[in-house]
Amino acid sequence: VADEPTQFNVPGDTVCRYQTDLKKMQGKTLTKKTSALPSGEIFSCMTAFEFPGKSIYIMVTESDIENYPGMALRSLGAGRFKTELWDTDKFFIKGGKTPWRIVTVCRSLDQLIHCRVITLAAAPVNDKAYENADWIRPGKSAWSYFIDEEHSRRFEKIMEFNALAQEAGYEYNLADNGWRDWAKTERGAFKKVKELVNDAEKRSVGIWLWQSAMDKVWFTPYRRRFFKKCEKLGIKGIKLDHIESETQFMTEFYRLFAREAAEHKLMVIYHNPQKPTGLRRTFPNVMSMEAIRGLQCKADADNDTILPFTRMLGGNADYTPLCFSVPRCLNEVSICHMLASAVIYNSAFFTVSEDPSILKAHGLDSFVSPLPVVWNETHVLPGSKIGEIVIFARRSENKWYAAVFNSAQSERKINLPFSFLKDGAKYEAEIYTDNLTDQRGYNKVKISVTSADSADIAMRPSGGFAAVFREI
């Protein structure tokens, strides 16, 4: 295959939202009128178009990549776009199967976030490794690396996070980049990992290990020994990092890594990966992937009011939310905006970037610790507008959560009806609102409410709102 001539034509009066970080999907989302996009510009193929004033939303992307490189879009000008196989030259395919090229058209933001075509176009699971897959368990994970990268190099600190994860009620603890420094040799480091796992098991906490894609995992004998060792030690999952590619080889490696991990009952998350293309339907142990401008790129309220309607259409995103103690990452957003991110961005492996003891000291553990990572029901509520405000309601069993992102543009006041709650039921609402004069402050109240009630909410620029409703 030398090229792919597939083209997409979009009316020039639409608004295009796109980003240009093709390697890892961490660029800031840009907004331009489609007719103003310069010819030759290349951007990631999770691009959204909005018809102003018409409530019509279009997404162009792909799904079910197998033995094929990933695609981007090249602007040809005047609303015309061409498939760009940006990370490859000529290549060969066997069997002639190409990925699905997807154009979704939706009439509302709520309809847009419920469009599962990216996932459903991918091949369903068909592998014996996933029979009796009770080892695939979603959950929250403690993570020391974000607060201080040196923490992962200190065995005692990761052991401390075992205890913190237990106290917070998290299912997992992630030992990130640096665990091999626990000893002079990798063999010695694995012995320390076994100590970590033994301690974690006593606390009903599972251990995940970090692994770089730039290391020896390309080498099949090493990779198989690595997986076998992890299974023997009792590791629950692997975080594969530093991928940054959409070559034919790499898109196949995603599949190979997930398949071989499943043979050893290991879950997987991918960091710095390609765009999401429905991989989890084929390989259910792929719990999440980054491919998002998350908290490691510092909080960005304007970007947050776009990503739920672009990136999140591809499924789970490891945004790594909730860190309040690293000022450069908190940036200008409020505490309530950060709490809202934990509800709006979903991930079956949910990496909590803050020290659990700090969340507890700030009185936020009652919201974060019981927070679900899998939802029964989700709604985008009226008043949401891409690039300005996002209003979500989610249900997990008999609990509802509401979350709001405000952009950085201005202070905003809204009335939020609780009509998403079950009629006739009473709820205890735990409500978090912005302190309008203090970015790091927040107001917390508990009140009894029903579906007939509502809340008047005032938000700072880059502010937000979060609430949990427990049926009583």
Model-predicted regions and their roles:
Residues D13, Y18-M25, I431-A452:
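Solvent-exposed beta-strand/loop surfaces of large extracellular or lumenal domains
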Residues K385-D423, F465-A466:
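Carbohydrate-binding surface patches
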